[in-house]
Amino acid sequence: MTTPRRTQQQRRDQAETALLNAAAELVIEEGVHSLTLARVGERAGYSRGLATHYFGSRQALLQRLAHATQSGFVPGLDGAPPGLSRLLRLIDGYIGALGQLRMPNRAFLLLWAEAATAADLAAIFRERDEAFRSDLRQDIAAGITDGTIRPDATAEDVAVAVLAQLRGIGLQRLVDSPAVDTERLRRSVTGYWHRALALPQP
C-alpha cells in the first residue's frame, strides 16, 4: 500500500511548524537573543536558509512565533459567545494551561517578559496584548448588555487587570513552579472575578 504524496501546501505547513517549534526551543533553552534564522533552520533539521525563505527576516519570525504560541493557549473558546461565561472560562483555562506549561506556552511567556527590554519584541507584544484586552473588553460589554455583569464595571480597567494577573501568574510559574498551585489558583481566581463582576440575579 503506497502512502499518499503530500501536497505542496502540506509540506510547507509541516516545515513551518518545525521551524516555529525549533524557534520556541531555542528561546526556552538560550533566550530570545540567541534566535537567528540560520540557527532556527539548522535546529529544525533543514538548511540554514529555509527560515529566511519562509519568514524573510528575524522580526517576521518573532511576529509569527508570538502569534503561534499565543494561539490555542486556552483551547475550546472558539465560537463561544462573548460574555461573563466566556471570560470566566478564559481565566480558568489560562491558569489551567499554566499547570502544564507546554513548550509553546513557556516560549510565549519568555518572549513576553523579554519585550519590556527588547525593542524588536515591544511592538509585537503591544499588538498581542491589545488583541487580548480587546477580547476581554468584548466579554465585559456583552455581559453588561445581557445583564450578567454589573453595569458599573469598566471594561478597560477589568481588561488591564485580568491580563496583568494572568501574565503575572504565568511568570511566577516560570520562576518558581512549586509555589504556584494552578489547580487551586484557577478556582480561587475564577471565583474572585465572578464575585467581582457578576450582577446578582433576582
PLM regions and their residue ranges:
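Helix-turn-helix
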Residues: 18, 22-60, 64
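C-terminal peripheral helix-coil segments that are non-catalytic and often amphipathic
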Residues: 1-3, 85-96, 133-134, 138-142, ...
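Amphipathic alpha-helical packing segments from all-alpha helical-bundle domains
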Residues: 74, 100-103, 119-146, 157-160, ...
